[in-house]
Amino acid sequence: YIFNDFMLTKEGAATLDEIAVRVYATVVSTPSKEYAVLDGGTKTFYMDIVPETPPYYYPGYAVVAGNDDLQLLRMNEEHGILTSKKGDTGLHVGDIVELIPIHVCTTINQQNEVYLYDGETLRKEKVAARGMLV
């Protein structure tokens, strides 16, 4: 796999540091301190896994980088709901959240473009096989 993903960490084939893909979502609403609404839902994070079930007990549809307390357990097409194990997410409207996809193949397949960073330069590329089966 060229990107690695969280699934591969459960298999022992990759570490979090070896996952090359990040999705950045913006907090668009915080109706309660217990949850925050992101501008990334099922059109961004695929639902081909069931969080918190055997055999791997994935912590959600994506992992919040650097924050094991936050979980992405609910989504609709356009929005994801981040909750906190501790009760208060600490997030505010406008905050940018860095997420690691559980399954990168389906995440990339749903995007029109990706941004590539080589340590110096950031460039935008079209996803050539976007929406394709192969």
Per-region residue spans from a language model:
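Active-site anion/phosphate-binding pocket segments in diverse small-molecule metabolic enzymes
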Residues: Y1-V134
